[in-house]
Amino acid sequence: MSNQDYKVADISLADWGRKEIKIAESEMPGLMETRREFAAQKPLKGARIAGCLHMTIQTAVLIETLQELGAEVRWSSCNIFSTQDQAAAAVAANGTPVFAWKGETEEEYWWCIEQTINGPDGWKPNMLLDDGGDLTAVIHEQYPDMMKDIYGVSEETTTGVHRLYEMSRKGELGMPAFNVNDSVTKSKFDNLYGCRESLVDSIKRATDVMIAGKVAVVAGFGDVGKGSAQSLRGLGAQVWVTEVDPICALQASMDGYKVVTMEEAAPVADIFVTATGNYNVITHDHMKAMKDEAIVCNIGHFDNEIDVASLKQYKWDEIKPQVDHVEFPDGKKITLLAEGRLVNLGCATGHPSFVMSNSFTNQVMAQMELYNNPGKYEKDVYVLPKHLDEKVAALHLGRVGANLTRLSEEQAGYIGVSVDGPFKPEWYRY
């Protein structure tokens, strides 16, 4: 490996990965159309992007889109279990410095991020693309002198966006940041429709359990929780929801879910899913109260929504990779998936390509906006303008056979919009 500018599990998986990438491209019209529109202009020529985002097949299509638009890219995964090794191999074999494999240790995880920051021949990033905020944090904490040369960061997920707003509030944000998560075509699609498909896929792959008839608890009823609850109910589970926010709790009630506390649910439910972005949502006491063989998993970004650390004192029995029995002193076992990390990427392959095309097209738009407009943005957090959000949606309509109605000039004037959009004000909630 000493003379190779990548580290993956098995480079021989590249051909398999390339075949899967080709299939994904047909399901990712937003990215492919963006390539066609901008490839000749090379709007990212000169951009040196350090990326830290789940190294999946879909991410491979994102990486190669950025490269088609002129960027140099170095990449790591933002989760120790989320890499698809065939995807990493295919990207590495194509000449991209990628440092990611499924089952990294914590130490290896941080080493991989480090490789994306410091490349050969003095290579340093001038753009960041992050998921969860770890790359951004490393730059701020360990490489503050580098920030003067970085145009900005685009952040993928709710947790990372929260970290950015906290840094901004404290005056600690050292570069402009785009909150990609809160583009409508990300949060209302990836977070909701993506989780609606990938959660049950991961539980099924991990356990083969019958979901119908089970009591399933979803902690958190944001977009991720909404999609998770829908998926479990769709397979016949009785779905309960825990919430701290009265608005979300009322939404859950109006959607027909029973809103309970985790203390009420713990002794009764069969399946537990955390989707809050908070920590210690399922505590040691909750797990002690659970039934034998209860299934416990997390679909939020970090692994601390479930107090997994408190379980280390007990006996663990690995059933298969990312599926563990944890045995309590009384002999009761719970089934913990992906060690409390993102279950849909630890036990399955994440969201489908089509919905990730929405999210990743937003990422490309954000990268182009930041790189091509130096000095336009302060060291603060921004969202993409409405017309770009609508453009991302429009790029995907043909793939699902949707035909838009066009306003007449009179109709557009009546509601005070252009016939070409944007069609909603910035504050519209969808």
UniProtKB/Swiss-Prot annotation:
Cofactor: NAD(+)
Gene3D superfamilies: Adenosylhomocysteinase-like (3.40.50.1480), NAD(P)-binding Rossmann-like Domain (3.40.50.720)
Enzyme Commission numbers on file: 3.13.2.1
Bound cofactor: record note: Binds 1 NAD(+) per subunit.
PROSITE patterns named in the record: ADOHCYASE_1, ADOHCYASE_2
GO molecular function: adenosylhomocysteinase activity
Record's function text: May play a key role in the regulation of the intracellular concentration of adenosylhomocysteine.
NCBIfam families (alphabetical): ahcY (TIGR00936), PRK05476.2-3 (NF004005)
The protein's name: Adenosylhomocysteinase
Taxonomic source organism: Halorhodospira halophila (strain DSM 244 / SL1) (Ectothiorhodospira halophila (strain DSM 244 / SL1))
